[in-house]
Amino acid sequence: MSFTLAIIGRPNVGKSTLFNRLVGQKLALVDDAPGVTRDRREGEGRLGDLNFTLIDTAGLDEGPKGSLTARMQEQTETAIELADALLFVFDARAGLTPNDRAFADFARRANKPVVLVANKSEGKSGEIGAMESYALGLGDPVQISAEHGEGMGELYDALRPLLPEPVEDEEDDEPADQSEEAIATRPIRVAIVGRPNAGKSTFINRLLGEERLLTSPEAGTTRDSIAVEVEWKGRDFRVFDTAGLRRRSRIEEKLEKLSVADALRAVRFAEVVVLMMDAQNRFEEQDLRIADLVEREGRALVIAVNKWDLIERQGGQIAQLRTDADHWLPQIKGVPIVATSGMLGEGVDRLMQAIQDAYAVWNRRVPTAALNRWFEQAISQNPPPAVSGRRLKLNYVTQTKARPPSFVVFCSRADAVPESYLRYLVNSLRGAFDLPGTPVRITLREKANPFAHKRKRKS
């Protein structure tokens, strides 16, 4: 049975640093500015033999009803409701503040086990601040330094009585090379990217049926890459909502730079990337840059044109979108395009099906016999050109891997094959085997000539 811990506390006391420490990887943004964590984030935490689900929350600042700050508070309250126990973190160096005391009252009202965590306890000032916390009436403080990993043993001792007995990790015996059946059943990792305020979080909330991610008219509401689990028609998906990707020249704040880097990491971690565009401002320069990044990273691509409900004359526009996509994105011809409305919930099923189809294409292996037939036909219809009076010879092709589909063509002079002919092979192969929206890699490799040495000796 899963045990859930929520890390709570006022802003900038080190909650995300502790989250990263326990999850074992840098999933949450960490910065000196208060309010860096806006959404609640979840991860699988481990401390010794203790395994648990960990929730990182926004700090509870009071704000006007309906404001972004107030909705951050609602997210935190929801996380507390979901948790089995609370890690109440305060800054021992700063000592107790009125907000900490108000927060302690809030934690007590939750009627759940509370572990009081005195973070930043290094040095004499940290020791004094930790002693002050007895006034909160929440028991002995656990003194730690999340940044340096100090006090984890003491935190283990405090958590051990709260958690059920540890069980053996059954995943250790899983083979490294997964079968086709495993690929067909494991969760598909999906990153939803796009320019700020394209409606990414609104769409995921519609998919989940709850306001899991903060949404706001102001661009840049999502700062972290938020991972959520989704089940659709019996298939599991792990969906990452990311910070909007802007042009680097417009990224001014350090925090926004961290957010963009976080989004780029999500793209690299994903298997399928959904590029979400605003229907009223589509195929702008930054959209094309993002699509190019996805192709270079070798990920399957699906384009979601969101806020489609705001388009008045929709007839024929999808066909025009496909034409525009092939024009602007020739390196990923045939990319699937789905019109959606996160606000109205339209296009959800179509997009999820497109993601699943794109994942299948990304994993595709072409049968050897069919690949050989295509290769012979392709070079017969359009033979490689002559270079310096000598015709290039392409010998044979083989698929080296999937994810994305990658091939090697063995030939006589690899460095002499024009880029235009390589593009011809890629587009021909993509069309022959129905590989839309996924990068197709063809590498040229010279085949050793066993008679070259003999000819040299004879001459």
UniProtKB/Swiss-Prot annotation:
One of its GO terms (molecular function) is GTP binding. Disulfide bonds: none annotated. GTP 2 binds at residues 194-201, 241-245, 306-309. Residues 364-448 form the KH-like domain. The keyword Calcium does not apply. CDD domains: EngA1 (cd01894), EngA2 (cd01895). Residues 3-167, 188-363 form the EngA-type G domain. One of its GO terms (biological process) is ribosome biogenesis. It holds the Pfam family MMR_HSR1. InterPro entries: G_ENGA, GTP-bd, GTPase_Der, KH_dom-like, KH_dom-like_a/b, P-loop_NTPase, Small_GTP-bd. GTP 1 binds at residues 9-16, 56-60, 119-122. It comes from the Bacteria. Keywords: GTP-binding, Nucleotide-binding, Repeat, Ribosome biogenesis. GTPase that plays an essential role in the late steps of ribosome biogenesis. HAMAP family: GTPase_Der. Belongs to the TRAFAC class TrmE-Era-EngA-EngB-Septin-like GTPase superfamily. EngA (Der) GTPase family. Associates with the 50S ribosomal subunit. This is GTPase Der. It comes from Rhodopseudomonas palustris (strain TIE-1).
